[in-house]
From Swiss-Prot:
Upper taxonomic lineage: Eukaryota, Metazoa, Ecdysozoa, Nematoda, Chromadorea
Domain Tyrosine-protein phosphatase: 30-309
Entry protein name: Tyrosine-protein phosphatase non-receptor type eak-6
Gene name of the encoded protein: eak-6
Subcellular localization, as worded in the UniProt entry: Cytoplasm; Cell membrane
Keyword set, alphabetical order: Cell membrane, Cytoplasm, Hydrolase, Membrane, Protein phosphatase
Active site as annotated: 248
Gene Ontology CC terms, in alphabetical order: cytoplasm; plasma membrane
Membrane-topology annotation of the record: Peripheral membrane protein
PANTHER family per UniProt: PROTEIN TYROSINE PHOSPHATASE 36E, ISOFORM A (PTHR19134:SF561), RECEPTOR-TYPE TYROSINE-PROTEIN PHOSPHATASE (PTHR19134)
Amino acid sequence: MTNIREDENIFMFLCEKWILINKNHIWNRINQRINIIADFDRYQRARTISEGQRTENIHRNIYGAVPYDYNLVNLTSTQRNPLGYINASVAEFPEIGRHYIITGAAQDTQIPFFWQMVFEQKSPAIVMLLEDVELGIEKSDKYFPNNTREELKFGIYDITCKEFVKRNILEYRLLEVSVGNETHQVHHYKFHGWTEFNLPKYEDFMAFYNTMKEVGVPLLAVMKNNCMSSFFKKYHHTPPTNAPIIQCSTGGARCGVFIIIDILINLIDNRIKNSYSIEWWMLKVRSKRNHSALTNQQHSFIYDIIIKYIRTRHNQLRHLEKYLEAHANTVRMIDSTNTEDVDKFIKPRDWIVDFDERDRLIGKLQFRKRLKIEKDQVSEQKLVHLKSQLHLFQDTYKYESYVLQ
């Protein structure tokens, strides 16, 4: 059974933060600050992008998106790709034991290298967050068989489809990659209805996300320590990460949105202590993948998904939203030109809400609501007693929990 108190705290924090951002109309300003902080961090840590800018590699990039050098996926050198370059980044989050490979759409001549990456990295899953064609623009070339009757070959890699399931917005395939006598199976999930120009509905996104859990292996493999295997075997490529591959048109914003949502849901499900600051995780993802800035709408979408996810787990929490709105109205307006004010929405330790003060106000509003309900049901003497309690409560009383009140 889930711990409702822990979920309740996360729900209250994110819901009121979302209310305050909307109230102050500062989505754009927050994202501007995130971009500035991310760029400063990039230059301070000297995160270069020279490998992707080399003459031999630049044609392998998608829409000009060039990845960082420090976390590139390196392939075994081949005659066609002597530098072993692929536009893909290993995004590791050791503090929570999670990792991903982020990459862009499969482009014709680069498809053999994509499957080389899948095979060498032993990736358990591919999450495809793009359509082949979006608003008349071709985004991805065909790189996998459509059904169990079809087989494809890219270079030395034979790709067969062992299972195929289609459910509204989801296509699932169990694919097998073969090189000689060696094989590797990978779960392929394709999401329909999420393009560069729109956002999916909560119901569609969660149907896709939950189906991934039901159909195959868990999307996320816990990070494995490759130090020992690397010690005993000299790899000519990045040692196998066993990381799932997250794929959108450029390996940018949609991948970032999906990863942040996936991380937060896993933190919630496993009751892991965390700041649960969406903006902090946006910065973390930006540090792993260049060109992964989110739009205001994508930023807000993450809030919408996580708030609704918690509310779905505990439907009674919906009653808190009106109280959180009431408290948000007592919080001073934010000066969007004041960098220090805006940064309070980004840095977890600088949050502007006094939780104790918020709890007292919500408790008082709930007490008054109960008092109003009881007015017609109690004697005059009881009403006097209840009112005296209310007077005392205004200075001293605080609810320990707001659910079921």
